[in-house]
Amino acid sequence: VFLKSVLYNEIRNFCLGKAEPTTNTKKSLFDPEAVFVTDLTDRNEIFKTVSQKLYDLGYVKEDFLGDIIEREDKYPTGISMRPLSRELPDVAVPHTEGDYVSAQLIVPIALRNSATFNNMVNPSEALEVKFLFLILNNDPDMHSTILAKIMDFLAGTSVDDLNELFNSDSNEEIYDFLENNFEIEK
């Protein structure tokens, strides 16, 4: 009853212009329903499985799967983590054009077994990737910002914390860690 009263008064005062809301208005780039942990090891099978779920959630359009496979073939997104630490597995940041998505979201995908992606910097180099940050972005002006935020997160998070994240088997733990540690605004 007390909490209902406090909430009621907060809403009432806000509507009357007497107070600011105290709720968290932080924009999230993550959705707990769009976090994946998989045993799949084939890149295209991973994309197929995740794409179907994202389509069911309304985040991607029908042609998303074909475009993400084609784009990954032409413009690889693997990132070697060796410059940060030899202890870390490699990651990838696959993405498509905004025409194929309906949201702005980062979809974390933990791989129990590695999958081969080519290096973004050196496309002829194959990397054994264990974690994906799949970028969904329907705002073309935000693409480089989201990618920069991912790079800042990787560079600014301890090796131990990244290892724990990359090797997690729990969708909830992955979501909670990213939601609490990924900085959206600076």
Report the location of each language-model feature.
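Cytosolic covalent-transfer regions centered on His/Cys nucleophiles
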Residues: 1-186
